[in-house]
Amino acid sequence: MLNITPIPALSDNYIWAIQKDNDVIIVDPSDAVPVLAFIAKNQLNLTAILLTHNHHDHTDGMPELLSRYPQLSVYGPQEVAQFANRIVQPEDHLTLFDYDVRVIESAGHTAQHVSYLFGNEYLFCGDALFSGGCGRVFTGNYQAQFDALQRFKALPEFVEIFPAHEYTLSNLKFAEAVLAPSCALFEIQERAEILRSRNQPTLPTTLERELQINPFLQAVDLDQFIALRHQKDNF
């Protein structure tokens, strides 16, 4: 079993620290300072970094981390080749911490965005999927983003999902506006408000939960997804 900890960074980022014993893998380091502090405080060995896509709020910590750990294994798609020395492709399989890690194509937000699924248990999805939402489609390729969501929907419902941003409350306000009222949505929104009032993360989430509250996962076809995405972009 892995110990997974969110390292808060910037205004709303989570850098995920995946820990096994005294070793740690870092996902999408937007800032090196909190990562280095976390490693030092917990006396950990940094063994690898996983990058999901090439936006600065996921990679800005890389220069400092690579200067400290020049031999580090860094996994990521071609669009982060300036930092990654292990280029991954969709449906590649890695072995990390004795887990089979599947690389899932998650394009749309960026052209080569990927997600990492640890043994059908833990999904690190960057900006492809949020609690109650999904990433903006900066590429304009709505088909790719819709297809990514279908891949996520096909996973076991017990999978824990680790997005890179704390967007849950704003996403749930949109969900409340476009979905039929439900006990699940009300209860999850209430829980999220309590957690944020205590400055605690609302993440991780689960696929089971997201299927109940995430409008984008409920879109039945591409046209409905595009309409929802345009609504959210202007919400």
Curated annotation (Swiss-Prot):
Per the record, the coiled-coil ranges are none
The residues the record assigns to binding Zn(2+) 2 are 57-58, 127, 165
Annotated InterPro entries: Clx_II_MBL, Glyoxalase_II_hydrolase, HAGH_C, Hydroxyacylglutathione_Hdrlase, Metallo-B-lactamas, RibonucZ/Hydroxyglut_hydro
Pfam families reported for this sequence: HAGH_C, Lactamase_B
Give a GO biological-process term: methylglyoxal catabolic process to D-lactate via S-lactoyl-glutathione
GO MF terms listed in the record are: hydroxyacylglutathione hydrolase activity; metal ion binding
Provide the alphabetized UniProt keywords: Hydrolase, Metal-binding, Zinc
Disulfide connectivity? Answer: none
Q: Which cofactor does it need?
A: Zn(2+)
EC number(s) recorded for this UniProt protein: 3.1.2.6
Instruction: Give the family from UniProt.
Output: Belongs to the metallo-beta-lactamase superfamily. Glyoxalase II family.
State the oligomer form and interacting partners: Monomer.
Q: What does this protein do?
A: Thiolesterase that catalyzes the hydrolysis of S-D-lactoyl-glutathione to form glutathione and D-lactic acid.
Q: What is this protein called?
A: Hydroxyacylglutathione hydrolase
- Give the lineage: Bacteria, Pseudomonadati, Pseudomonadota, Gammaproteobacteria, Pasteurellales
Q: Name the gene.
A: gloB
